Amino acid sequence: MLNFLSLILISLLPISAFAIEISSPAFKDGETIPKKYGCKYNGGKDISIPINFSNVPKNAQSIVLIMDDPDAKKVVGKTWVHWILSDIPPDTKYLDEVKYGKLGIGVAGKNSDRSKKYFGPCPPKNEHQYNIKAYSLNTKLEKSLKALTQKKFEKLYENEIISSFMISGKFK
């Protein structure tokens, strides 16, 4: 009887009660990002981090993915955007690892290096934390985003965001 009541209560929740989730087979949240995903200047290969998507709300029209480095603020005076993809189809389950993140899916935005590609973690010294955040949106943006940090994106698109989820990794 309890399971039946639970199912009824869950079915009464609004569609937006289900929030997008992401994970990576390359590393667990809070752990170290493997070297190959780093920038070529730090011995990496600039291969994009593979991402799994789950629990995308049924009313989502698109997904946006932003990877940034808030620790860069201490070095360059701003949060550094390493990767931004908009208009990822909401039925996408997985983004594969690809050189420079050229996936052929979604719309690549300009990173802080002013290029439309994945730029791997590249701290000049000391360990940095890299945040990868996915947003489910109630619309398609149909444009390339320009070096928007997660905070700026959230401010500009607060009315379009249905849900979000973030994982973090360390890199030295």
Please state what every model-predicted region is.
Residues 4-16:
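Sec-dependent N-terminal signal peptides
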Residues 18-172:
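N-terminus-centered regions that define maturation/targeting leaders and the start
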